[in-house]
């Protein structure tokens, strides 16, 4: 099941380009639109694949299981970003994050209320 929530295995480890790391790291896979369509369809049904499902999809799409695994891994990451709302909506307006707007409703007012006090006392 989707219990391994740590870092992925060596397959997920991609050294930054130009770092000289990564022993002959594989080229970026160019998926065909048919493959992407199928992968997206599967992802729409379930966010996590069993080993059997993964191997069946890999065979059906003539991909390696690692490719299917990594695609799902990346797709889940993208899905979580979108779900968290860090992605602009269609109108191009950035999504307002209510958590940021109302960080501390009382904080600023209490500060403002505290400042005039000494002046009032001086004027009294």
From Swiss-Prot:
GO cellular component, one term: nucleus
Annotated DNA-binding residue span(s): 24-83
Species per Swiss-Prot/TrEMBL record: Gallus gallus (Chicken)
UniProt protein name: Homeobox protein CHOX-7
Broad class of the protein's primary localization: nucleus
GO biological process: regulation of nervous system development; regulation of transcription by RNA polymerase II
Chain residue ranges for the region called Disordered: 1-30, 83-124
Gene Ontology molecular-function annotations: DNA-binding transcription factor activity, RNA polymerase II-specific; RNA polymerase II transcription regulatory region sequence-specific DNA binding
UniProt-listed InterPro entries: GBX-1/2, HD, HD_metazoa, Homeobox_CS, Homeodomain-like_sf
Matching CDD domains: homeodomain
Localization of this protein: Nucleus
Record keywords: Developmental protein, DNA-binding, Homeobox, Nucleus
Signal sequence segment: none
Presence of keyword Chaperone: no
